[in-house]
Amino acid sequence: MIPEIDIKDYSYPLTEDRIAKYPLPERDSSKLLVYKDGEVSERVFRELPSILPGGGLMVFNDTKVVPARLHFAKPSGAVIEIFCLEPSDPPEYDRAFAASGKCRWKCVVGNSKRWKEGPVSLLNPHGSPEIEAMDLQAVLIEKDGRTGLVEFSWKQGLPFSRVLEIAGTVPIPPYLNRESESIDLERYQTTYARWRGSVAAPTAGLHFTPATISEIRQGGTLIADVCLHVGAGTFLPVKSEHISGHAMHREPFSIKLDLLRQLRDGGREVTAVGTTSVRTLESLYYAGVSCIEKGYPEDVSQWAPYEREYPYSTQEALDALIKFLEDRGEDTLVLGTRIIIVPGFRWRIVDRLVTNFHQSESTLILLVAAFVGEDWRRIYDFALSEGFRFLSYGDSSLLYRKK
């Protein structure tokens, strides 16, 4: 049954001065709130390796943020902002980034009322010869509200990934209330980012340095990666009074066969780095159920966890995914998920969560509340009273699931 949750019950007072507008000089110098067995304490993030018990499994999201925000101008001078969401032709990320000369993307279009037809040209306010030679143009193929299908074309034989590097800016969150700057190119990206495709960083990972990860490994924790490309929906507020009226956007994810086997075999407590890793890991059960019942894994729907009781164990669901890949000689599961995690969710894989402090009345606050119960209020009250910095560039927390 879809939970009837009033989003107003998950609000807290966050003033502008508590939002971190810029990262700290050192990634691992942020504060770390630790919640365990109902107790809340304050540490420093670089102490995380000594806090984590050994013998566990830590899962990161190794997606990479792309400079997906582009500014074009009509011949009339009207500025059109185009925010690339996901590739359409070619539909695979790797092929789309390698495309030369032309490609199509699903985009959010700013000032779309002013763009009915005809090509628009990339703005070049500083007269860059590189931008001039590239001659990047965009045509709106079809429109659906604020989103649309946009065809990009350019010269010079460059791959589209290079086009974005030259022409695009990092799409930092709107609540920072500033334009992206050179510091964001490095710091709004995890040190282990690998696969291009996100329009928002998995911000829990921003605190990790290679040294931190190395120390965690040395403490006996296995390190593994999933990849979920974070979509623009991560910035969308919940506008409906009840969470049942909120629509989650599809986000593509992938996970290696070896990690599926590790999760199935168990014996290690799982620490997820960030809510995107959580949503990927907890989607696996429902993909496995689809595999058991239909013979193949389907994208995970928003309300799959709440629609009915499932008779299968987590091991059975993971087994089904493993067999599906093995039968096809494949080593990576690639799917999409719209899963929403709210109070009442049945946890199957994740035991601990590293996460930042999220916006009031957001789906991410609901995920935290599902993880720690009503203690989410104590956690946030503590963070507010002790001067923690909030949101993407803010401080972090290590939460142990309430069992």
Where are these regions (language model features)?
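Surface-exposed, charge/polar-rich loops and edge strands
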Residues: M1-K403
